[in-house]
């Protein structure tokens, strides 16, 4: 059904939770393709033991290069990009499939809704050790946001042909900040107008575990927000904030396909 690509950096405890949730809570058969950055914590041995395909660099390739490598191994028509600190809710794939079937073409970008560190505030733990899976499974259906416009976040699903057409993630965004809205801009330019965040497709998000883990490590670059914003601005001629407001209408309620922006006074002077 889906080829699920996941970047990971010495984060085996969370990767295991993520993979087990996919196996346990899916209706269909998927392939899981992590990209292992460094992986000196036993990650590659774990993946081989579980007969999972993966890509590997001995250095920190981070999100863009790593996901482009993993996507080359995808055998299914749809590529789902996820983080290794996600726990997938039950029937997530059935929910996504219904959305894909309703659209009936390939020009779309569908994403999920993040619980805990994301759109929905439901605390079921902030670590692998204190994650209350039972609480999440009992309460996630009653914790809701809404279907929303203009998501630029994982987990997201696009057709493999569309991924290949735009070249996947742009690798100049090292280690990754800014690459999500950049991908959306490339999709916009080839005619994608459905950028839908789906309330019922939920993942529990522990919250940028790797960024927190390596924040003070001078050898591991994990966050370059200002650099990513600058690259986007120089590349596209406007900021990420501007793109999300005037093009994607991010976080407003989903009302259907987006239209070209209304180039009024606010567009030019705000």
What do the PLM-derived regions correspond to, one by one?
Residues 21, 28, 35-45:
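A conserved acidic beta->alpha catalytic loop
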Residues 96, 150-158, 162-167, 172-201:
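A short, conserved alpha-helix in the catalytic core of glycosyltransferases
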Residues 64, 137-161:
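A recurrent flexible, glycine/aromatic-enriched loop bordering the glycosyltransferase active site
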Residues 90-128:
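Conserved donor NDP-sugar-binding/catalytic core segment of glycosyltransferases
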Residues 79:
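Short aromatic/hydrophobic "clamp" motif used to bind/position activated sugar donors
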Residues 57-74:
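Glycine-rich, basic loop-to-helix element that forms the pyrophosphate-binding segment
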Residues 11-24:
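Short, well-formed alpha-helical segments that are part of the catalytic scaffolds
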Residues 115, 174, 196-219:
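Active-site donor/metal-binding and catalytic loop motifs
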């Amino acid at each position: 059904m889906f080829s699920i690509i996941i970047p990971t950096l010495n984060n085996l405890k969370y990767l295991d939770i993520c993979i087990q949730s996919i196996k346990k809570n899916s209706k269909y058969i998927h392939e899981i393709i992590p990209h292992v950055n460094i992986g000196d914590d036993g990650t590659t041995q774990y993946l081989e033991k579980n007969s999972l395909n993966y890509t590997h660099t001995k250095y920190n390739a981070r999100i863009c290069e790593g996901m482009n490598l993993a996507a080359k191994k995808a055998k299914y028509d749809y590529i789902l990009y996820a983080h290794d600190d996600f726990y997938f809710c039950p029937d997530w794939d059935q929910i996504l499939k219904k959305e894909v079937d309703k659209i009936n073409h390939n020009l779309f970008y569908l994403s999920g809704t993040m619980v805990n560190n994301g759109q929905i505030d439901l605390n079921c733990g902030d670590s692998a050790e204190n994650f209350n899976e039972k609480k999440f499974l009992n309460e996630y259906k009653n914790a809701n946001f809404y279907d929303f416009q203009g998501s630029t976040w994982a987990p997201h699903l696009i057709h493999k042909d569309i991924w290949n057409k735009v070249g996947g993630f742009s690798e100049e965004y090292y280690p990754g900040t800014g690459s999500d809205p950049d991908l959306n801009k490339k999709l916009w330019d080839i005619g994608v107008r459905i950028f839908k965040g789906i309330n019922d497709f939920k993942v529990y998000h522990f919250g940028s575990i790797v960024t927190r883990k390596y924040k003070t490590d001078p050898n591991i670059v994990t966050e370059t927000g200002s650099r990513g914003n600058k690259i986007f601005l120089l590349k596209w001629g406007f900021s990420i904030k501007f793109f999300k407001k005037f093009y994607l209408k991010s976080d407003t309620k989903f009302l259907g396909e987006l239209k070209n922006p209304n180039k009024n006074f606010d567009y030019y002077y705000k």
